[in-house]
Amino acid sequence: MILPMPSRMPLIFKRGLLPLSLLLAVSGCGVTDWFGKAEDPPLPGQRIAILAYERGLRADPEIAEVVVQLPEPYVNADWAQPGGSAAHAMYHLSLSANPRRVWSADVGEGSGDVAQILAEPVVVGDTVYTMDSRSLVSAFAADIGTRRWQVDLEDEDEDDGFFGGGIAADGDKVFVATGFARVFALDAATGETLWIHKAPSPMRGAPVVSDGRVFVVTLDNQMLVLNTETGERLWNHVGVQETAGLLGSASPAVARNTVVVPYSSGEVLALLTDDGRTVWSENLSDIRRLDPLADIAQVRGLPVIDRDLVLAISHAGRMLAVDLRQGARAWQAEIGGVQMPWAAGDFIYLVTNDGQLVCLQRRDGRIRWVTPLPRFVDEEAQEDPIRWRGPVLAGDRLIIAGSHGEVLSVSPYDGKPLGFIALGDGAAVAPVVANNSLYLVTNGGELVALR
């Protein structure tokens, strides 16, 4: 079954490939211009090429002549939740063609052997909020990066090894889920604790906030729904427990009166936000793969609700597009990934487990183009695997950040690489964009702002 393209949200389209570049060198404290002209001399230093890697997915030759059209970029004032909004659908964001590094700040403890940074930064108006690998939450001025407040939410009575969680902001509150099995509501202006809710188990993903409710998923596959004003539990849903899983977890997606919750078991369910009644359920764990790791069916990438179409992808190699209201499948594809798909107009962009950046048609899941990405720092020896975060569509380019210290820019129209950022450290989480600014958090615990 193929669903028609919903027409509820008006879109203005732009045709063709725009030759914009995302080539920026960041080394220590220095940053060069973004460039892309063929006649310019190359920057010094080691290059990691976009490989001619033929394993995996292929573009559909029958749609090779389809012109990729995108909505016009718009300025989003906020990136207040994981994925940008409660529905995780941000479309095409505005970002200048030549952003410069304007400031950087220390968010706290970075990723290491014991704890990892899992929280995306969130941006609301003139403030950026972050959380480090040990539940240290900070607020920074978005214009110059000065710290406004900082609060340590680590539970001193707990053993080492409890980390993860994330943050979301709504109105005058910041909501924090921690690996210490606590959900906090903080005053957005001061960091003062307003309420604390003790969860039944730790959390590895960020909360999502919508219509007076906080939605958060625990490590043992329960979704808690809390009142934003009091922290009181309104209802909860219990999924199938899973003993094996990936680091981190996906946040639910919310639109209208429906929440789509992903679990590490591969379950994806649509529930009514009022009382938790099930609208429909799917399982993304039944594609059999030769790779034993693919047996982990976890839905690690955030599900997306794009104009009443739910997009969900699992690590086990299955992607579904499902009607939000009826639960009817629009299409399914044998594609695995752990990053959030990015929806824009008639197309969907995603990074696969096999290190490919893919453009799909929204209406039927057919592949318009595929770009192989570097998979190892040392490709010849296949050592030091690269983990890619993203993509984000901003300023007519797809931006993906690597764990090896480079950020790539790729054309959304044909998949051709446009350039790279050479960071001094790898990206811990996917980049975020708000108010014409790009924000990156590194494994070393640095927040970098470019505009």
Where are these regions (language model features)?
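Structural signature of WD-repeat beta-propellers
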Residues: D132, F162, G171, T178-G179, ...
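Extracytoplasmic beta-rich repeat domains
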Residues: V102-V122, Q150-A168, W195-S210, R233-A255, ...
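WD40 beta-propeller blade core
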Residues: S138, F184, L224, L269, ...
